[in-house]
Amino acid sequence: MTPPFCWYYPPLQEGILCRRYQRFFAEIELTSGDRVTAHCPNTGPMTGICQVGAPVQVSYHADPKRKLAYTWEMIFVDGTWVGVNTSLPNRVIASALAAGILPELAGYGTQQREVAYGQERSRIDFYLTDHPQEPPAYVEVKNTTWAQGGLALFPDTVTSRGQKHLRELQRLRQTQPETRVCMLYFINRGDCDRFAPGDSADPTYGQLLRAAYNQGVEILPYRFAIEPRGIQFLGTAKLLL
């Protein structure tokens, strides 16, 4: 049975990646032969997926207020489409939560976004309430694109912000043991069925993730298939710690 789509892209245009530069820009040659500058909505290193000459898909926006009309949405590497637009995962998760298709998080009647929590008043991506049986849940979302042979890895570089989030989630778990605290990894490619911390990129993050898990923070590595039509939820990846 083919998994249902939980997100649909607008009409996309195909091209090839000529280069990515200054983090926010990508030069794309469309199939029409036109070369355009597209916004790159991913400020990270894009380890393993930023391959010159690879097929890409871009969206077009005719808004005169935009500096760039095109946005780079995905790239085809290692036989699979990989999502590039880091603004999408939270929107996809919101849609999937509303549809009740995420097994560990199904059944919550209310979702709130960017809710302040903890001593530092950081903002959690989702705060879920009104479940008939489960306690409220705090859910932080991380976009994951780095992979090695079917193993999804996060992070792909040192992330002090990510380390901070894990420390805050551990404190949240300690101070509010009556609630659920979840770290959700959005695996933005359909060819991975396992997930592990990217220890070679950021060993401190890996140590913190294992410590958080041991303290009761739930680790939810969710698999998604990306294609030009839309995004499908494939289930939960095997967690390797």
Swiss-Prot record:
Signal peptide: none annotated. Disulfide bonds: none annotated. Transmembrane segments: none annotated. GO terms for molecular function: DNA binding. Pfam families: SfsA, SfsA_N. PANTHER family: SUGAR FERMENTATION STIMULATION PROTEIN A. Belongs to the SfsA family. This is Sugar fermentation stimulation protein homolog. It comes from Thermosynechococcus vestitus (strain NIES-2133 / IAM M-273 / BP-1). The lineage of its organism: Bacteria, Bacillati, Cyanobacteriota, Cyanophyceae, Acaryochloridales.
